[in-house]
Design a protein with these regions (language model features):
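Feature responds to low-complexity, polar/acidic, surface-exposed segments characteristic
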Residues: 4-12, 25-75, 83-104, 110-151, ...
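Extended, alpha-helix-rich binding/interface surfaces that flank or overlap catalytic cores
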Residues: 157
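Mature N-terminal segment immediately following signal peptide/propeptide cleavage
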Residues: 15-24
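Extracellular structured ligand-interaction cores
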Residues: 154
Length: 175
């Protein structure tokens, strides 16, 4: 992908790799938009692509929506992530798909995609603290300096996902 705003990208390797494997696409003007925020719906798409590859067919998950506020383009991805226990709603049957994903939410989603936090009791009373600690232990943050409640940019999400792919160890279950 030819990126017009390459000089603005901090996490060059992460953006190059995650873009090459289909997690991110550039914009029509040739930019990547490294400072643009990632929504909760977009994060679900990224997670599905991380787990199943670009072009993952989510049509069977788009037929009935788990949440009442998810747009059609994202329904399959959000529903698949929900069925895997990777994402949760915000209450009243809502997902809040257009809200900016926070660091803590994205790290929790990545940890769950790697097999951690499969039960609500896995993180005790404070899911945010538990996700942050597990994300740190797994090396998801790398050199990123992020706060738990801060919204994430495309540049930073690329780095978190890149680290999940290259540094983190997925849970291994014994049969």
């Amino acid at each position: 992908m030819c990126i017009r705003d390459r000089a603005e990208i901090v996490n060059q390797d992460a953006v190059a790799v995650t873009s090459a494997i289909g997690m991110f696409e550039g914009y029509e003007d040739g930019s990547f938009g490294p400072e643009n925020v990632v929504t909760r719906a977009e994060m679900a798409v990224i997670i599905c692509t991380m787990l199943y590859g670009a072009g993952v067919n989510v049509n069977q998950f788009a037929e009935t929506s788990v949440f009442t506020d998810v747009p059609a383009w994202a329904q399959g991805y959000v529903n698949l992530c929900s069925s895997l226990g990777i994402v949760a709603g915000v209450g009243d049957g809502k997902f809040d798909p257009n809200a900016t994903v926070t660091t803590a939410q994205a790290v929790l989603m990545l940890c769950r995609a790697l097999g951690y936090f499969q039960s609500a009791t896995d993180f005790g009373n404070d899911w945010m603290l538990a996700a942050t600690a597990k994300g740190t232990a797994l090396g998801l943050y790398g050199d990123l300096k992020l706060t738990a409640n801060a919204g994430l940019t495309r540049d930073n999400v690329a780095e978190l996902v890149f680290n999940a792919l290259t540094k983190a160890v997925p849970v291994q279950y014994n049969e």
